[in-house]
Amino acid sequence: QFISDIDSCADALAALGLAASERITISMPTSPQGIIAFYAANKLGAVASMIHPLSTAKEIEFYLNVAKSRFALTLDAFYAKFKEVKDATPLSTLILARIPDYLGFVKRIGFNLTKGRLIPKVPPDPMVKWWADLMKGSYPKAAPARMGTDDLAVILYSGGTTGVPKGIMLSNMNFISEGKMVSEWGKLDNATSVLAILPIFHGFGLGVCI
């Protein structure tokens, strides 16, 4: 199912116009949507710019401009911050996910009756695409991009403790080598399951768990 969702997401992103070497900003907590979009972008040869979902509007503006992202994925709860900075950035397509997208029926109802009530409604907006709708759509099959190990795959950001955060450019080989290292260290094989709860917008969580 996971691989199927990645393929479906890649098809949807390609239909929206995301192409090789373009950037998509992923501003998500550790979640199915964030992880699926990460791999889908890589399948297309696009670059995932990973940012903290609790970033301020000013920080989001900075990150979108550094990465030159026309595309972004975030939760519906953070729509207003992206809308606020749209005109000052290259952003043209904002994909909104919802926490209940991957919850079971009972948990989804429970969320909508509690925490969900606190999330402001998103008004009609031509730049907004809903994750759930995209994943149900039908699109031409997107062919995997031909990528080299040294090609740019991800932009992560430094903490900015000594100044303005810097975009750290990571290649495909950075992740391949980290995967091999973790696999060897943990004696992992294709039958092993790992509970990954670290944040995907952080180097540790992205590099080790993803």
What are the language-model segments listed below?
Residues 24, 41, 72, 152, ...:
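Conserved S/T- and glycine-rich ATP-binding loop of Class I adenylate-forming
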Residues 119-157, 164, 187-193:
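Conserved pre-ATP/AMP-binding loop-to-beta segment of ANL
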Residues 26, 150-153, 174, 186-210:
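Conserved AMP-binding loop of ANL adenylate-forming enzymes
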Residues 14, 32-51, 60-61, 182-184, ...:
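Hydrophobic alpha-helical segments in the ANL/AMP-binding
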Residues 1-31, 35-39, 56-61, 172:
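Conserved AMP-binding/adenylate-forming core of the ANL superfamily
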Residues 2-8, 135-138, 168-189, 197-201:
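Conserved structural elements of the adenylate-forming
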Residues 15-16, 43-133:
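Structural core segment of the AMP-binding/adenylate-forming
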